[in-house]
Amino acid sequence: MSTHINAKMGDYADTVLLPGDPLRAKYIAENFLENVKQVNSVRNAFGYTGEYKGHRISVQGSGMGIPSMSIYINELVREFGVKTIIRVGSCGGIAPDVHVRDVLLAQGSSTDSAVTVNTFGPGFHYAPLADFKLLDTAYHVAGKLGIETKVGDIFAADRFYNDELDMEKLRDYGILGTEMESAGLYLLAAKLHFRALSVLTVSDLIFGDEKATAEERERTFNDMINISLETAIAGK
């Protein structure tokens, strides 16, 4: 048991899928895993452990933004020995060739969050990156499933509502999409020495009107979930 997780040691698998939305965690557990056990309910940040094709997998809701997510990552890794974390979440599409429901694999994550500066000090701009083996596996798994993915840089915003941010410049520099977590995930992976990858579904477009409904975000991002689960068990 930790401060924000009321599970026991051994309740979590070595690999955890980490959606921000606790209801998405519940959806994954109920629709993709077998022999499911709920292992966390503190603050309604639901956590579950079950089996996927005979392999033990956990899923844990982490909330919105780097500060909330960092709490769960630190406790999962430090207190429960988790070795691999795959973020499954939504993002806003930025690049011209990105469309709603596209699946993005975050090779790296730029950010305007102070988390990297607070870690390394001013003047050093750390570049948070995914685990290459996980990234490569996810890309090839998606191909075998017939799911097209786009691989590249994701922008992890410190604020959801940010009128000062120059989205056109992000687009010009090839940023695929924006969310609020991946840079923190990759930074903590480097610090705590676990494997990490963000697999994201585009829920809306920054430069367009197309968007997925809240219900669709919760229940129909199955391509992202299938890629993540197959990546989690690859080679086991």
From Swiss-Prot:
Phosphate binds at G20, R24, R43, R87, V88, G89, S90. SUPFAM superfamilies: Purine and uridine phosphorylases. InterPro entries: DeoD-type (IPR004402), Nucleoside_phosphorylase_CS (IPR018016), Nucleoside_phosphorylase_d (IPR000845), Nucleoside_phosphorylase_sf (IPR035994). One of its GO terms (biological process) is purine nucleoside catabolic process. Gene3D superfamilies: Nucleoside phosphorylase domain. GO terms for molecular function: purine-nucleoside phosphorylase activity. The active site is at D204 (proton donor). The record marks R217 as: Important for catalytic activity. It catalyses: a purine D-ribonucleoside + phosphate = a purine nucleobase + alpha-D-ribose 1-phosphate; a purine 2'-deoxy-D-ribonucleoside + phosphate = a purine nucleobase + 2-deoxy-alpha-D-ribose 1-phosphate. Keywords: Glycosyltransferase, Transferase. GO terms for cellular component: cytosol. Catalyzes the reversible phosphorolytic breakdown of the N-glycosidic bond in the beta-(deoxy)ribonucleoside molecules, with the formation of the corresponding free purine bases and pentose-1-phosphate. PANTHER family: FI09636P-RELATED, URIDINE PHOSPHORYLASE. Belongs to the PNP/UDP phosphorylase family. HAMAP family: Pur_nucleosid_phosp (MF_01627). This is Purine nucleoside phosphorylase DeoD-type. The gene is deoD.
